[in-house]
Structures are given as structure tokens and as C-alpha cells.
Amino acid sequence: MGEISITKLLVIAALVVLLFGTKKLRTLGGDLGAAIKGFKKAMNDDDTGAKTPAASEAPAERLSHKE
């Protein structure tokens, strides 16, 4: 009852293609791929940008505890 079989998935895929058309789905897939690619690039740029200033900063002074 709760299982999703291959035939059910094929029927759903056929309905989606009939409703939206192949051109709309192709455009949607391309937009989604570009969004994911842009997100990954932004994450990598953010990581490299965060590491660069820290490496160029002078080391902090060492504090010693005096009793």
C-alpha cells in the first residue's frame, strides 16, 4: 500500500511531462543546475575568503597568568 513501484513513478513522470512539456522541464532543470553550481561556487569563495585574512594577520600576543 505504501510502496512506490517503478510503474507508479513512470506514470507520475509521464503526467509531469504532459502537464509542463519537455521545454519547460529542460529550462527548469538548467535553472536548478545553475543555481546549485552558483551556490557551490559561493560556498568555496566564502571559505577561501575567510582563510586569507586570518593568515595575513599578525599572531596575537601571548597572555600569561600571574598569581
Swiss-Prot record:
<comment type="similarity">
    <text>Belongs to the TatA/E family. TatE subfamily.</text>
</comment>
<keyword id="KW-0653">Protein transport</keyword>
<keyword id="KW-0812">Transmembrane</keyword>
<keyword id="KW-0997">Cell inner membrane</keyword>
<keyword id="KW-0813">Transport</keyword>
<dbReference type="Pfam" id="PF02416">
    <property type="entry name" value="TatA_B_E"/>
</dbReference>
<dbReference type="GO" id="GO:0008320">
    <property type="term" value="F:protein transmembrane transporter activity"/>
</dbReference>
<dbReference type="InterPro" id="IPR006312">
    <property type="entry name" value="TatA/E"/>
</dbReference>
<dbReference type="InterPro" id="IPR024905">
    <property type="entry name" value="TatE"/>
</dbReference>
<keyword id="KW-0472">Membrane</keyword>
<dbReference type="InterPro" id="IPR003369">
    <property type="entry name" value="TatA/B/E"/>
</dbReference>
<keyword id="KW-1003">Cell membrane</keyword>
<comment type="function">
    <text>Part of the twin-arginine translocation (Tat) system that transports large folded proteins containing a characteristic twin-arginine motif in their signal peptide across membranes. TatE shares overlapping functions with TatA.</text>
</comment>
<keyword id="KW-0811">Translocation</keyword>
<feature type="transmembrane region" description="Helical">
    <location>
        <begin position="4"/>
        <end position="21"/>
    </location>
</feature>
<protein>
    <recommendedName>
        <fullName>Probable Sec-independent protein translocase protein TatE</fullName>
    </recommendedName>
</protein>
<keyword id="KW-1133">Transmembrane helix</keyword>
<feature type="region of interest" description="Disordered">
    <location>
        <begin position="44"/>
        <end position="67"/>
    </location>
</feature>
<dbReference type="GO" id="GO:0033281">
    <property type="term" value="C:TAT protein transport complex"/>
</dbReference>
<dbReference type="GO" id="GO:0043953">
    <property type="term" value="P:protein transport by the Tat complex"/>
</dbReference>
